[in-house]
Amino acid sequence: MTVVVEGQQRTHELVIITGMSGAGKTVAIQSFEDLGYYCIDNLPPALLTTFLTLLRDSGKNSTRIAAVMDMRGGNFFDALIGALDHILKEGDIVARILFLDADDATLVRRYKETRRAHPLAVSGLPLDGIKQERALLSEVKGRANFVYNTSNMKPKQLREKIVKEFASEADTIFTVNIMSFGFKHGMPIDADLVFDVRFLKNPYYVEELRPKTGLQTEVSSYVLALEDTQILIQKLTDLFDFMIPLYRQEGKSQLVIAFGCTGGQHRSVTLAEFFGAYLASKENTVITHRDINRRKE
């Protein structure tokens, strides 16, 4: 059920994630979060209209929201259809339901593997809770826009399916972030790959280069002319050409590559600029020099 009204402005998108407990809702909400959706876990349907009213009052022109609604909401879950009808009347939000399902045997196996209790299994037997939940969700499943059976899916496959269905063109852009930094200011905690280039000859000890940075030709030419730098560039070029397509294939949205030297002024900046320019012809690339303005610290 897609809730739309022709002729009215629709500025917000809502994806309601629901379905059987153990069918993959946690993986789903994480996938939507990676796509840039504002995500809410375990939102009671009775509060959905209140939340959307606050969203409208915020004045934001466009927002994408993904909300998990499941049987943890108790009796509130009965309010879901009423909340969707309310959205239909307002007409400024496109709402879709993603229902995640799996066969009974798979759900029982998953509960046993995690050693968690089914939320509706009063007797303690997962199958009893599964049967009760399936009956309670039958109407919602019938009104869903998308029904994914995850019985034979791995988490990665579910994520790929969600990305294929719900990602915009902007969401699928893979970005390589190239960073320079100084070890004396601490290692970057968000880097995927860190390369220590302190083994290269340091321009800091060349008096006329000391006050300059790797952004200036005198320093970059000095660093790039070193034999060790040329060998490093050759090896890292081969490594990046091999690895980066595989990172993209794995579904990563970004890769952070950091080059570190002592202070983050000369060698790391030069290498970050070089590989930023090299990768820019292949990938969406962003260059950041974290410590370049911390010379006196």
From Swiss-Prot:
Keyword check for Transmembrane: no
Source species of the chain: Lysinibacillus sphaericus (strain C3-41)
Protein name: Nucleotide-binding protein Bsph_0448
Record-linked Gene3D superfamilies: P-loop containing nucleotide triphosphate hydrolases
Keywords linked to the UniProt accession: ATP-binding, GTP-binding, Nucleotide-binding
Coiled coil: none
GO molecular function: ATP binding; GTP binding
Keyword Cytoplasm: no
